[in-house]
């Protein structure tokens, strides 16, 4: 049986050798060039392949059509991936008749994603393992072929556990590969309800929070001990790294971060003390704890701290245009909850952000993006990340005012994008699920789904094509002029402060707000074309968390990416949404203040939106990019979102209005 292998690291070397020992023919091996900035303590797949006389390649993008064609020419019967760091395209996965199989360093479906070796130690697990699974489009989600458990000892650190996993992987492969070679490939579906996802870890994630339980701090030390970057803290401006530690249950009543003693060196945590066995000051040598205390000038009672502001990076400045809008005000709240963000915002009103106006890290100017261009250009230049959130985004306005939609949604935003290009600033741009239009795919894929819109005489599509054209312009600026960008596509986000009942009164609101207005005023709920259109409703808290992670941009994984942000599990028709809303309304404590329910009324879209409207039957996102780039998964049920949104609007109605 002929195999093509994708491999890197020690696990890659083990996998290559196991495949050879099982009698497979290896047509080629694909690996990575070592990164000079990375501590390459591990074995070299390229050197192993060269020594074995096997062709080896390290392309920058193995999914490029040129490489896909070359792999196809190799005619592999089977494909293996052993710790190869990039996802393989479906085109590659489908080249091998027997399938493509990946070795993952956890007991799937737990700990999907990045760095499972480190995460299991961070989380204090007592067991992990290795899993060989069939590769599918979603990372680490395919059927399980075989797995092997590995016990985690209390004294295990990252390197010792790494060696255990390599041994377990070799045993697993030695056992299963001969069976697979004969065509007998077990397949057990993963239980999605048990799946957990973890993202890439960065060196800065090793910063110790002494207010955590001592077991948490000790587990962090274990998880990132050498040759990983290490857990670290500060004494004043002096950084030091802890390479090994042990737990002492008694903190003697000391405050977290306080030095209890220097010989041995013990530091108080939330519920105990950490004894530092070995460590390193700055870029110095590794020494035992008491010598480290001497080097740092520590004495009993000293307080360790987070990096001082003078020695750390300045706060990240985020410019939000349209800051008073639904996404803008919720995002502002999330950013201000983090110490290292400063928010600059502009909008034509401030009712939704009034709670932030006195915040020292929030800077607001009331203005119009079509008028205050000088202020905008200055602040694009001044800030680090730009979010142009201003848009007309309600369907009835697409048919009422198509030219205004184009002028604001495309022309004004294009000017802002050009400022970002001019000053080389990162832009996080709100595309929209509307760009998919009448796409017929079961779920909409950012990188593969076609964007399909209706005829020119249906102005309903002006919003979709304005956004799509900006997406394409931004992409081109990224390709040709190095613009750093991320496009995010929200799918029907809902929650408090979505818009207003007054907007619903003039027909310029989202669907749920219009439905709530009908309940508040005792008018029939209008179901456009019967309300059979399906959407995937997403809680604003889930959406904002994903957007926040895009801004954080861990490992620059979001650069140049398009990311759907929606909840595929919350798919419902507008009729089902209305029924759920009515049920929540009837159970609400304020129900008695409002008129009786006036029933449902089916209306044609033409009579409601005008002749220029055209609807979409379904709109369901693929969120593989969000899982992969953000380590994000939506978690809030649709009923919870509906109840919170309803509660917000009902409590916003004043007493006199309720009585009337």
UniProtKB/Swiss-Prot annotation:
Record-linked InterPro entries: Arna-like_SDR_e (IPR045869), Bifun_polymyxin_resist_ArnA (IPR021168), Epimerase_deHydtase (IPR001509), Formyl_trans_C (IPR005793), Formyl_transf_N (IPR002376), Formyl_transf_N_sf (IPR036477), Formyl_transferase-like_C_sf (IPR011034), Lipid_A_modif_metabolic_enz (IPR050177)
What the record says about family reads: In the N-terminal section; belongs to the Fmt family. UDP-L-Ara4N formyltransferase subfamily. In the C-terminal section; belongs to the NAD(P)-dependent epimerase/dehydratase family. UDP-glucuronic acid decarboxylase subfamily.
- For this protein, what is any one GO molecular function term? carboxy-lyase activity
- Mind giving the lineage of the organism this protein is from? Bacteria, Pseudomonadati, Pseudomonadota, Gammaproteobacteria, Enterobacterales
Residues noted as binding UDP-alpha-D-glucuronate in the record, renumbered to the chain: 393, 398, 432-433, 460, 492, 526-535, 613
The record lists the organism as Salmonella newport (strain SL254)
Cite the position(s) of the site with description Transition state stabilizer. Answer: 102
User: Site described as Raises pKa of active site His, positions?
Assistant: 140
Residues that bind NAD(+):
347, 368-369
Give the positions the UniProt entry annotates as the active site.
Answer: 104 (proton donor), 434 (proton acceptor), 619 (proton donor)
Per its record, the protein catalyses:
UDP-alpha-D-glucuronate + NAD(+) = UDP-beta-L-threo-pentopyranos-4-ulose + CO2 + NADH; UDP-4-amino-4-deoxy-beta-L-arabinose + (6R)-10-formyltetrahydrofolate = UDP-4-deoxy-4-formamido-beta-L-arabinose + (6S)-5,6,7,8-tetrahydrofolate + H(+)
Question: One Pfam family this chain carries?
Answer: Formyl_trans_C
State if Lipid metabolism is listed as a keyword.
yes
Q: According to its UniProt entry, what is the function of this protein?
A: Bifunctional enzyme that catalyzes the oxidative decarboxylation of UDP-glucuronic acid (UDP-GlcUA) to UDP-4-keto-arabinose (UDP-Ara4O) and the addition of a formyl group to UDP-4-amino-4-deoxy-L-arabinose (UDP-L-Ara4N) to form UDP-L-4-formamido-arabinose (UDP-L-Ara4FN). The modified arabinose is attached to lipid A and is required for resistance to polymyxin and cationic antimicrobial peptides.
What does the record give as EC number?
2.1.2.13, 1.1.1.305
Q: Which residues bind (6R)-10-formyltetrahydrofolate?
A: 114, 136-140
Q: Does the keyword NAD apply?
A: yes
Output this protein's name.
Answer: Bifunctional polymyxin resistance protein ArnA
């Amino acid at each position: 049986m002929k195999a093509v292998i994708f491999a890197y690291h020690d696990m890659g070397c083990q996998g290559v050798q196991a495949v050879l020992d099982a009698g497979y023919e290896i047509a080629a091996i694909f690996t990575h060039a070592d990164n000079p900035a990375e501590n390459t303590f591990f074995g070299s797949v390229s050197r192993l392949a060269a020594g074995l006389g096997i062709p080896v390649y390290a392309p920058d993008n193995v999914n490029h059509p040129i490489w896909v064609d070359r792999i196809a020419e190799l005619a592999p019967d089977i494909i293996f991936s052993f710790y190869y760091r990039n996802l393989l395209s479906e085109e590659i996965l489908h080249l091998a008749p027997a399938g493509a199989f990946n070795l993952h360093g956890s007991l799937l479906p737990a700990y999907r994603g990045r760095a499972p070796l480190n995460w299991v130690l961070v989380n204090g697990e007592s067991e992990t393992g290795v899993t060989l699974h069939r590769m599918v489009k979603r990372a680490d989600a395919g059927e399980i072929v075989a797995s092997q458990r590995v016990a985690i000892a209390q004294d295990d650190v990252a390197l010792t556990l790494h060696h255990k996993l390599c041994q377990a992987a070799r045993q697993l492969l030695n056992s299963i590969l001969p069976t697979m070679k004969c065509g007998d490939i077990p397949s057990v579906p993963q239980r999605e309800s048990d799946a957990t996802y973890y993202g890439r870890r960065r060196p800065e994630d090793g910063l110790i929070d002494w207010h955590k339980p001592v077991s948490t701090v000790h587990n962090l030390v274990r998880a990132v001990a050498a040759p990983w970057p290490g857990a670290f803290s500060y004494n004043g401006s002096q950084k030091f790294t802890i390479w090994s530690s042990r737990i002492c249950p008694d903190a003697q009543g000391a405050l977290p971060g306080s030095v209890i003693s220097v010989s041995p060196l013990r530091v108080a945590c939330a519920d105990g003390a950490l004894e530092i066995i070995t460590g390193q000051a700055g870029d110095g040598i590794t020494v035992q704890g008491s010598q480290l205390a001497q080097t740092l000038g520590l004495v009993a009672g000293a307080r360790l701290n987070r990096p001082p502001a003078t020695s750390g990076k300045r706060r990240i400045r985020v410019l939000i245009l349209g800051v008073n809008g639904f996404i803008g005000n919720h995002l502002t709240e999330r950013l201000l909850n983090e110490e290292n963000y400063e928010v600059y915002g502009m909008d034509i009103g401030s009712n939704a952000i009034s709670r932030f106006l006195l915040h020292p890290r929030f800077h607001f100017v009331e203005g119009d993006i079509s008028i205050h261009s000088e202020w905008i250009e200055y602040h694009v230049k001044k800030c680090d990340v730009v979010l142009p959130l201003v848009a007309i985004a309600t369907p009835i306005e697409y048919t009422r005012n198509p030219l205004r939609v184009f002028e604001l949604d495309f022309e004004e935003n294009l000017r802002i994008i050009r400022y970002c290009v001019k000053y080389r600033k990162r832009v996080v741009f709100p595309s929209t699920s509307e760009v998919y239009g009448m796409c017929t795919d079961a779920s909409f894929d950012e990188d593969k789904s076609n964007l399909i819109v209706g005829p020119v005489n249906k102005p309903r599509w002006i919003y979709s094509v304005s956004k799509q054209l900006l997406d394409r312009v931004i992409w081109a600026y990224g390709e040709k002029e190095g613009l750093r960008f991320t496009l995010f596509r929200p799918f029907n986000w809902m929650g408090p402060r979505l818009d207003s009942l007054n907007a619903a009164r003039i027909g310029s609101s989202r669907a749920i707000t219009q439905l709530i207005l009908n309940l508040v005023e005792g008018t029939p709920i209008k179901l456009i074309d019967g309300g059979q259109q399906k959407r995937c409703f997403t809680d604003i808290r889930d959406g904002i968390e994903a957007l926040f992670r895009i801004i954080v941009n861990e490992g620059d994984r979001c650069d140049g990416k398009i990311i759907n942000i929606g909840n595929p599990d919350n798919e419902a028709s507008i009729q089902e949404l209305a029924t759920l809303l009515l049920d929540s309304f009837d159970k609400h404590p304020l129900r008695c203040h409002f008129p009786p329910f006036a029933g449902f009324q089916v209306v044609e879209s033409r009579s409601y939106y005008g002749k220029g409207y055209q609807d979409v039957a379904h709109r369901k996102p693929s969120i593989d990019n969000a899982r992969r780039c953000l380590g994000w998964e939506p978690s809030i049920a649709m009923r919870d979102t509906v109840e919170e949104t309803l509660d917000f609007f009902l409590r916003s109605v004043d007493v006199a209005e309720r009585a009337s």
